[in-house]
Amino acid sequence: NKKNDLLAHMIKDEEWDQVLVFSRTKHGCEKIADHLNAAGIKTGTIHGDKTQGARTKALREFKGKIFQVLVATDVAARGIDISNLPFVVNFDMPTYPNDYIHRIGRTGRAGQEGSAISFMSSDEHKFLRGIEGLLKIKIDQTSHESFKPNEKPSTAGRGKPRSRGPRGGKPSFSRNKRSSD
């Protein structure tokens, strides 16, 4: 998965010390965490299949910087407060535009600056349009300049090339800076 590779690359290359990553599904949370842990990035998860005790422990370990990354679903992350959280990543674009606001609201709290970054595959553009409509702004999109995905698109099903996203197959993301001015 190119998004997994890009996430691991950005965490390491840009030296992100504490990152909250949002996934649309519980299964997605575990897959992302498995990939990051295999890449040597200490990662925990919180989602609906975890007991309250396990979610509390994972959150405590993330706040205590035992985990560098915490991967969460929207529902499991509602109401959590992490002071001085520098990075939020929308690994999957949220289905509902209001969830985007809740997600990026986890960073840039109490006068601190923070960055929210959204990864987007070609089939998620409809979610971006919904967010832009709600916020009444155009969110900038870019490809990560030092991440080089495979140039040749893979084929699936009937031999047709599968899209890897905009800009010639490079995964795209958007970055929002937040500060409490």
Q: Which sequence ranges carry the predicted segments?
A:
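Conserved helicase RecA-like core
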Residues: 1-151
